[in-house]
Amino acid sequence: MAGHSKWANIQHRKGKQDKLRSKLFSKLAKEITVAAKMGDPDPEKNPRLRLAVKEAKSNSMPKDVIDRAIKKSQGGDAENYDEIRYEGYGPNGIAIIVEAMTDNRNRTASNVRSYFTKYGGDLGQTGSVSFMFDRKGEILYKPDAGDADTVMMAAIEAGAEDVESDEDGHWIYTADTDLAEVSTALEASLGESEHAKLIWKPQAPTEIDLETATKLMKLIDALEEDDDVQNVTGNFDIPEEVAAQL
């Protein structure tokens, strides 16, 4: 999400992490099950599954829950999920991408459309806003992984495309197809990362004011609380002084 560190701080201030934690494990487990079902159930032989397990561990998901999710993929009773992307505009024309995983397309489409309508947005067609984003891999390291120069050199050597460092951490960006490979290479030089995942990176984030941010948060909250929704991304940036008031 644009304004990554500020976004995390806003979620923390709002107590949103606690509110979503009950749903978080089920969303992570769903991704693990789907990744394992589509490929090899061994994370070492399945890059998508390896990243899903890594994300689950970084969110303190118990090992037995992770193992159960993998095992579920191999059973005959595992649900079939469709991966769908919805695109539209939020308040003040902010572009929004919603990634969902569902066993009922009609239910999910209806729910997502209703959230956009209720909170001042407009759901569009696939492709209506994704051209404003780049599909990238994002790897996050804490500030103590090293200074900006050290992390930059390690990232370049590992094959990354870009690095953004500030007091909250180091965000390393890769081509979407290189994420697993770069993540593995960085572990050898910088140790375990906080997360490594595919994202939609806004090409030109729009800085928003308090009124727009407040409206936008209502839409994003509603979307993220839906069981079928895995990720929500927008092309906005929230200034520090606005973030402090949310």
Curated annotation (Swiss-Prot):
Protein name in UniProt: Probable transcriptional regulatory protein Pden_1905
Family of this protein: Belongs to the TACO1 family.
Superkingdom of the organism of origin: Bacteria
HAMAP family named in the record: Transcrip_reg_TACO1
Region (Disordered): 1-21
Species annotation: Paracoccus denitrificans (strain Pd 1222)
Keywords: Cytoplasm, DNA-binding, Transcription, Transcription regulation
Subcellular location: Cytoplasm
Any Pfam family the entry gives: TACO1_YebC_N
BP terms from Gene Ontology: regulation of DNA-templated transcription
One term under GO cellular component: cytosol
Listed GO MF terms: DNA binding
Lineage: Bacteria, Pseudomonadati, Pseudomonadota, Alphaproteobacteria, Rhodobacterales
Chief localization: cytoplasm
Disulfide links within the chain: none
